Amino acid sequence: MRLLTTVAALRCYLNKRRWESRLTASEEQILDSMTSWYQTAIGLVPTMGSLHQGHLSLIERARHENSTVIVSIFINPLQFGPNEDYGRYPRTLEQDRQLCEQGGVDAIFAPSPEELGIPQKNIQESQVTQVIPPSVMISGLCGHSRLGHFQGVATIVTKLLNLVQPDRAYFGQKDGQQLAVIKRLVADLDLPVEIVACPTVREASGLACSSRNQYLTAQEKQQAAVLYRGLLQAEAAFKAGVRYSSRLREVVRQELAKVSSVLVEYIELVEPTTLMPLDKIQEEGMLAIAARLGSTRLIDNTILRDRQPIIAIDGPAGAGKSTVARQVATKLGLVYLDTGAMYRAVTWLVLQQGIAIDDDCAIAELASKCKIELTPSQDLQSPVRVWINDTDVTQNIRTIEVTSQVSAIAAQAAVRQALVKQQQRWGKRGGLVAEGRDIGTHVFPDAEVKIFLTASVGERARRRQQDFQKQGQPEVSLEQLEKDIAERDWKDSTRKVSPLQKAADAVELQTDGLSISDVASQIVDYYQQRLSQW
């Protein structure tokens, strides 16, 4: 692991890593321009140091999803107010270095303020170029008392994203307002990075992990756990049918009042993406708290969603995801969202228009303009009819030609971005079953039920051969199918954009020797078990 303290060293290191990644690919992979660059995915975990279990969870996620993981450690003077704790904020670089090494981090970027051209002043006094988020997002919640804080956050995060140019950057849900601001920043500035939100990690008492927790005495830590208990009370009220902000906030306030040393700064209910105040939850809301305990300021939040559960089914090609998902949706009365069919439809259109598979720009143009519709069908074999640009392609997308090229098309960032937006729009109200390769990790990371279906290559090849025979497709040998499936597994697992991965909270089902009905029944049983716990 490298410790880098200058911009020059960081750029040199990143250039070297990208080049090394290309050189370590096999000759066959290098010749395939579509896959030779996948292994260079870079993940950035921005921190202010004083690392704790929450940071380690971000590092673990980044390590799982990228070939290179960079952790930045920079105590940003721009986000501290004149009377805040910049001077006494914990500085534990050697301890942080050890934790990063244990977590498999490739490099730490720990520059001084001078190296980044940041004066050790607050944002109001600084002459540095600033990034100003929308005022409506930074005037409420923490922004009300921490003037200039989010301008300072946005400025330094933009600088780090520009310096590292990561494929993914990881932030915790605990700082819900910060997360929303950064997502908006990336969207508005069209920055080519995926912002990955990770769940809040808590101590045994329920207290959200924070670098500032070390300011607390043992007794204060126990008292501070009342914030989480307040959120739990609100969650219980929400599940019981309470939807109005005033009532939910009062539930939290009553719980916090039990600890007199906790001084509430705010209890607010806002829309999680826009941060606009909510009077009533229609779809989802973020219930956020800020409070002081002694000289320590604490924040916490929870997301309350008024929707039916989502079942996310992931797994490699030929694992039976589509058939299983259709059966599960039918048994539970949920909508089946055939995401794979959407990628197949785009692939069919690319082939139909004679566009080269490696012509990323032409494919990006096509994917961003095409119109895909999924409609229910009475056909048990094809319960979803697929339309692209008003053409019914339900049968066309299942051909060998489309099957052999869909992974390469689906791996292209522009294609996935265009289709994921549509999928997430459909999933807003829940009540659906979706299958693919990154549903639980990328499309619906907050799905209530996550399943990872898998089977041996030989089993999947036999299933695929049987499918082709039923469809009247030309005969393909098992040996060739096994080779194709193994190659597809590699492409799907190593692509830079949303690779095939098992979500950390997914249940894995090995389906060799099991019938479709057996697998569907297991998922339905698990769904009902989970439902009884909500």
Swiss-Prot record:
Main location: cytoplasm
Active site: 55
One GO CC term on file: cytosol
Keyword Cytoplasm: yes
Pfam families: Cytidylate_kin (PF02224), Pantoate_ligase (PF02569)
Binding site for ATP: 48-55, 172-175, 201, 209-212
Chain segments carrying region Pantoate--beta-alanine ligase: 1-302
Residues the entry annotates as binding beta-alanine: 79
Ranges where the record places region Cytidylate kinase: 303-534
Gene Ontology MF: a single term: CMP kinase activity
Locations listed in the record: Cytoplasm
Pathway where this protein functions: Cofactor biosynthesis; (R)-pantothenate biosynthesis; (R)-pantothenate from (R)-pantoate and beta-alanine: step 1/1
E.C. number: 6.3.2.1, 2.7.4.25
Keywords: ATP-binding, Cytoplasm, Kinase, Ligase, Multifunctional enzyme, Nucleotide-binding, Pantothenate biosynthesis, Transferase
GO biological process per UniProt: nucleobase-containing small molecule interconversion; pantothenate biosynthetic process; pyrimidine nucleotide metabolic process
Binding site for (R)-pantoate: 79, 178
Reactions it catalyzes: (R)-pantoate + beta-alanine + ATP = (R)-pantothenate + AMP + diphosphate + H(+); CMP + ATP = CDP + ADP; dCMP + ATP = dCDP + ADP
Protein purpose: Catalyzes the condensation of pantoate with beta-alanine in an ATP-dependent reaction via a pantoyl-adenylate intermediate.
Family, as annotated: In the N-terminal section; belongs to the pantothenate synthetase family. In the C-terminal section; belongs to the cytidylate kinase family. Type 1 subfamily.
Protein name: Bifunctional pantoate ligase/cytidylate kinase
Organism: Nostoc sp. (strain PCC 7120 / SAG 25.82 / UTEX 2576)
